[in-house]
């Protein structure tokens, strides 16, 4: 982290300057931070960040980089400039360091006047031996929760890069030429050529995207494949009624010469869209796609018949009559075996969903399904809201039948669809269904849904999360941090053994049970099927924890979890993040380039582990190469006993009752626990079949209900 100054400005004295008389009664200041750069014209200072307007007697932070200066301008309501001065931040930092980390000086302004400025220097917590000084100042880097981010999912079709898009104005599909209905992110739009389509029409796109179709590979593609090379004959046209562009789908604005019209097929486009329209004059993409699909299905059926014919005739040519006779035996009916049930999926017909006949199921499944069909949100009493976000809310809920307490995560279907996160929700459900196999993963009992919401019923962990606890003690001692880290390692290694990359490890997602053992929670960012050499390249995670290979756009595997684990361990031991920046751009630059600062008081084994986790070459990072369990920091850990929870945790949270929620943020607990209702029109237009495989029951839920 680069050091920074916390600066406060106050007591502006205009002096004897007559020009500011009357305006100096209530002046304000502007702060411009400028960077030193070398250019062809010589040395110069450039402002890269927005101008700040700090109120008097307030503070702001300025990072100390070589050559960075701060220009302070005092202004009045009717006067552009009263006075100003420029301060070199490095010199100000040196003055602070010589005066026990703080200074207070009068700045002489030009042309006249002066201002009182106080500054305090911050680097790392290691610069202060007395923790009480930080407690009095209230300065800790880990004072707020940090949300995860995920790059929009890109659908690659014929070189198009379609992403779910919100259309702020009426838009028509460029494939079927029908209106794109719905709210929020109604359809897809190509990031390269701006073509807008329905989500349902994505399989009907036949034109390749190159960003520009003139003399492009797209023309050659259709010329060779379909013998189609029909350029449009566009001419400027005056439209007398509202008309929409048939490429990007939006309205042609203006009073005259609003767009272009093809003389041959009558296609209407914007001037800006002309160069992006494919040479498909007179071609109906929808009908063409349906015809091609029919041809393909016919060819596949013919190929399948030919392969079956060859398979049947093959043994006769080899002359194995007895084998042929044995093939005519009636098929065997499988008998049910004694296998432990891993969970039962069921779906009750939702209002507005298609009700189709389902094949009969085994009797045991029908019995369980009949029991679980009764599970709905009305079977629970919502006592408190434990947390919320854009996705939905988390509640403390009591099951009416057994008086047991659960944590219910309620997702809003409209938000899930709007963010194109249906598959992420299904992944979270599948990962949670595996969690019963490991003690340090949050256990899920069941999932169910209504027309508006998706519900995860999980165990209630009333010990709170590590972010809540670290805010009260600022950092964990070595034994406590080591214990938590060891249990996190076991949880991560279990997920990796199942081909799952977690991708969102952070203090907020590590919960404590009433005994003080950790539980990893929130699996919405997980990636499945990552065994062997499999890799992915989705940009996602919480900014402070994102690995450098993700920022560089490289393909990655479970190596990113070990980088995030290093950030987590650093925060537990030192009390703040290893990488910093005033915005995401600076933070990501710090992650890619900077080396974390290690305080002098940090144990040698802990520093060695962090250094090996913060290796920027993924294949050389500890956890990917080498056994992290064998590191000297964990030499006193008995891993088998730890996994059996036979080692007492160093900290036991204060829990008064099974429904105690005192270890959660008060800002959420004070709100009324109720579901957020979605827009009725949007819900009615939603395809409920997208969530047809969501509902699930774990055998553990049946055991709890029937006990």
Curated annotation (Swiss-Prot):
Record's catalysed reaction(s): L-seryl-[protein] + ATP = O-phospho-L-seryl-[protein] + ADP + H(+); L-threonyl-[protein] + ATP = O-phospho-L-threonyl-[protein] + ADP + H(+)
Amino acids binding ATP: 386-394, 409
Cross-referenced SUPFAM superfamilies: C2 domain (Calcium/lipid-binding domain, CaLB), Cysteine-rich domain, Protein kinase-like (PK-like)
Any Gene Ontology biological process: inflammatory response
Cellular compartments per GO CC: cytoplasm; immunological synapse; neuromuscular junction; plasma membrane; sarcolemma
Domain AGC-kinase C-terminal: 635-706
Modified residues (Phosphothreonine): 219, 538
Localization of this protein: Cytoplasm; Cell membrane
InterPro entries named among the record's database cross-references: AGC-kinase_C, C1-like_sf, C2_dom, C2_domain_sf, DAG/PE-bd, Kinase-like_dom_sf, nPKC_theta, PE/DAG-bd
Record PTM: Autophosphorylation at Thr-219 is required for targeting to the TCR and cellular function of PRKCQ upon antigen receptor ligation. Following TCR stimulation, phosphorylated at Tyr-90 and Ser-685.
Domain named C2: residues: 1-107
Keywords: ATP-binding, Cell membrane, Cytoplasm, Immunity, Inflammatory response, Kinase, Magnesium, Membrane, Metal-binding, Nucleotide-binding, Phosphoprotein, Repeat, Serine/threonine-protein kinase, Transferase, Zinc, Zinc-finger
CDD domains cross-referenced by the UniProt entry: C1_nPKC_theta-like_rpt1, C1_nPKC_theta-like_rpt2, STKc_nPKC_theta
Free-text note regarding domains: The C1 domain, containing the phorbol ester/DAG-type region 1 (C1A) and 2 (C1B), is the diacylglycerol sensor and the C2 domain is a non-calcium binding domain.
Protein name: Protein kinase C theta type
Organism of origin: Rattus norvegicus (Rat)
